[in-house]
Amino acid sequence: MSVQGPQRRLLGSLNSTSPAAPRLGLAANQTGPRCLEVSVPDGLFLSLGLVSVVENVLVVAAIAKNRNLHSPMYYFICCLAVSDLLVSVSSVLETAVMLLLEAGTLAGRAAVVQQLDDVIDVLVCGAMVSSLCFLGAIAVDRYISIFYALRYHSIVTLPRAWRAISAIWVASVLSSTLFIAYYDHTAVLLCLVSFFVAMLVLMAVLYVHMLARACQHARGIARLHKRQRPVHQGLGLKGAATLTILLGIFFLCWGPFFLHLSLMVLCPRHPICGCVFKNFNLFLTLIICNSIVDPLIYAFRSQELRKTLQEVLLCSW
């Protein structure tokens, strides 16, 4: 809702371009380079946000309904859905309020609007941080379930899971409040970028190690059945494809946003970096897309959850 422009705030206005602007165009000024600027229509942004809201609400409802899903792994998935839900709700809310203000339908004092903007920005930032944290927590949980299978239930207990979940939410709220309060400090942006890189490295290392263990296990089975190449190659290709999709979507959806933050530190006034800043709304849209994809990757692949989801949908009719 702030009209200062996306590059002057940590989150800034989610729709700094005019609704009538073309979707794809070349922006230029007299001294700077020609820039490729992708404009995301407000209707598309709101529609994606609503799809994400529906998906993640269904995930939360299904896990809450089925007691068989009341385990640490599904609690982490549920919290990821809540984080993605908050990202979508707060982004849609900010966009809707800003459009109402621009249309003159909603009137308010500047101080009140600014306070509302700060609250929503804290909510968006906190949800982003918690979403990244729970993606890392799910990776750690899966790693322990594979490499410490016999001790998994003694390592990942419900009390420990609840403590981890509580710590993530508290840390997300505190860090997002500090990030928004000191958004114009270089250290804040560096912390956010470093956090993203740390989560990316953590997930890559854990999932690559899990893939290596799966391939090693497949080779052992192949030796017993004397079918080494077909079994090993089939599992290896399937695992590599899954790993590529998982990490690729994570990097594609989150990477541009954190590239934007990195360039705000490295070259805030450079014309070429300015071309990147013009696509800030596109980067936020990619994060919304990640909130849509997360349930497909982490939740809906579970047969038990899909069955419960069908029951939830049937009960709602």
Curated annotation (Swiss-Prot):
Ranges per topology, Cytoplasmic: 64-72, 141-163, 212-240, 301-317
GO MF, one example: melanocyte-stimulating hormone receptor activity
Compartment(s) of residence: Cell membrane
Glycosylation-annotated residues: N15, N29
Family indicated by similarity: Belongs to the G-protein coupled receptor 1 family.
Record function comment: Receptor for MSH (alpha, beta and gamma) and ACTH. The activity of this receptor is mediated by G proteins which activate adenylate cyclase. Mediates melanogenesis, the production of eumelanin (black/brown) and phaeomelanin (red/yellow), via regulation of cAMP signaling in melanocytes.
Protein's name in the database: Melanocyte-stimulating hormone receptor
Taxonomic placement: Eukaryota, Metazoa, Chordata, Craniata, Vertebrata
